[in-house]
């Protein structure tokens, strides 16, 4: 699913469902290899202020069915891989099997459930396996080797968190990220993507040069939408192209 890939995150229904589709397609056309679509949630413990703000705004006129509508509209125009990022509660409330089946039929390729540890994900993974949905699991810099190997077995790719804490833009990539990446690449057989704090072309260049198979950029895009609202399309195009230059 990923190989020297730029993965770009957007919040579903922010500022509207229609604009989310437009922003996703713009990023895909401008150099994003994978699109990550976030399901708004009222208690996003892994996310920093920028993405939290987008969730608060998106939830004002939100229903989960719109996530599937966004995915379907995107899939009609693009064959780029689509990863759905969600907390477990919205999935549980709809019903795990119903949610996964609907997501898959809408064109979503993989799901990342932020607050579902791999060792508690057996039933969820089983439903995904029956449906055809791929899984992505989060790994921290200090995830024990045995857990990392188990995640690797279950994941389409491993999403390595670059540092401790929450999502958000940072001035530089922590030395811890490079240490964690080297360790993960020595253990995992699946691709490893690095996220949390990646926001500049130089960050992308450094991480890809260090062996990352992909980089995830979220807060930088969401910040543009926070600032520009529905007028963010061309800024999204420019940022995607700039980040893409870091892969060369």
Swiss-Prot record:
Keyword Lyase part of the UniProt annotation: yes
Reactions it catalyzes: (1S,2R)-1-C-(indol-3-yl)glycerol 3-phosphate + L-serine = D-glyceraldehyde 3-phosphate + L-tryptophan + H2O
Domain of life, per lineage: Archaea
Record keyword Lyase present: yes
Chain ranges passing through the membrane: none
List of catalytic residues: 36, 47
EC number: 4.2.1.20
UniProt keyword terms in alphabetical order: Amino-acid biosynthesis, Aromatic amino acid biosynthesis, Lyase, Tryptophan biosynthesis
Pathway in which this enzyme or protein is active: Amino-acid biosynthesis; L-tryptophan biosynthesis; L-tryptophan from chorismate: step 5/5
A GO CC annotation given for this chain: cytosol
Xref: InterPro entries: Aldolase_TIM (IPR013785), RibuloseP-bd_barrel (IPR011060), Trp_synthase_alpha_AS (IPR018204), Trp_synthase_suA (IPR002028)
Record-level Gene Ontology MF annotations: tryptophan synthase activity
Function text: The alpha subunit is responsible for the aldol cleavage of indoleglycerol phosphate to indole and glyceraldehyde 3-phosphate.
Subunit text: Tetramer of two alpha and two beta chains.
Family label: Belongs to the TrpA family.
Protein name: Tryptophan synthase alpha chain
Organism for this UniProt entry: Archaeoglobus fulgidus (strain ATCC 49558 / DSM 4304 / JCM 9628 / NBRC 100126 / VC-16)
